[in-house]
Amino acid sequence: MSKYADDLALALELAELADSITLDRFEASDLEVSSKPDMTPVSDADLATEEALREKIATARPADSILGEEFGGDVEFSGRQWIIDPIDGTKNYVRGVPVWATLIALLDNGKPVAGVISAPALARRWWASEGAGAWRTFNGSSPRKLSVSQVSKLDDASLSFSSLSGWAERDLRDQFVSLTDTTWRLRGYGDFFSYCLVAEGAVDIAAEPEVSLWDLAPLSILVTEAGGKFTSLAGVDGPHGGDAVATNGILHDETLDRLK
């Protein structure tokens, strides 16, 4: 049993709570949407979900700190810290696209040790904890243990991404397009879904040039517990780099080389 089994159990309870809010407000005619200072959208469901999760964590783990997308928090990454993205994929959420999820992770001295990704509109939930593997349920089915693919050549690989604009802003558009031209298949599954599909072995590479910690924390442990590799573009393990590359491990070094 994982050292963090009780924390994972709490994270799964948090996911249930989140689903009860987000799914109820999805496609609601009275959904309230506003713009944050960075001009990205935030809905009343984002705010209500993070508030509810913070309240439950504060009751269950009063000594733990919390960092969330909507209400901020401690960024020192010492001790035990919960990381929350109430709705990853808010732009999808507010347009009625079902590809969105609540992301919940526990960091121990900055390292993700437990994580849950819950996508109720897709009837899917993924989770992982240190040393206990990566798992997924679909439509309430029995949990299935996940393993990354064994694809060993880029020209046989499937790659998923979110957008091209970020690569251009990093002056890496040409390198990224060259990488995609090399791969067998390119799809824009986007956001959390790309990384979950890497963990499932359905996709071999996922990459983003600009992304926040709360977008990545549970995804990094999901991919690594499934046997994959998760780093920044600079090759640093974990979700703290501000960008991300996840692969089945076999393709990782070559992928990073192509993106330099």
UniProtKB/Swiss-Prot annotation:
PANTHER family: 3'(2'),5'-BISPHOSPHATE NUCLEOTIDASE, PHOSPHATASE. Its EC number is 3.1.3.15. It comes from the Bacteria. This is Histidinol-phosphatase. Belongs to the inositol monophosphatase superfamily. Substrate binds at residues 69, 87-90, 187, 215. Mg(2+) 2 binds at residues 85, 88, 215. Disruption phenotype: Cells lacking this gene exhibit an auxotrophy for histidine, but can grow on minimal medium supplemented with histidinol. GO terms for biological process: L-histidine biosynthetic process. It catalyses: L-histidinol phosphate + H2O = L-histidinol + phosphate. Pathway: Amino-acid biosynthesis; L-histidine biosynthesis; L-histidine from 5-phospho-alpha-D-ribose 1-diphosphate: step 8/9. Keywords: Amino-acid biosynthesis, Histidine biosynthesis, Hydrolase, Magnesium, Metal-binding. Mg(2+) 1 binds at residues 69, 85, 87. One of its GO terms (molecular function) is histidinol-phosphatase activity. Catalyzes the dephosphorylation of histidinol-phosphate to histidinol, the direct precursor of histidine. NCBIfam families: his_9_HisN. Its cofactor is Mg(2+). It holds the Pfam family Inositol_P. It is an enzyme of class 3 (hydrolase).
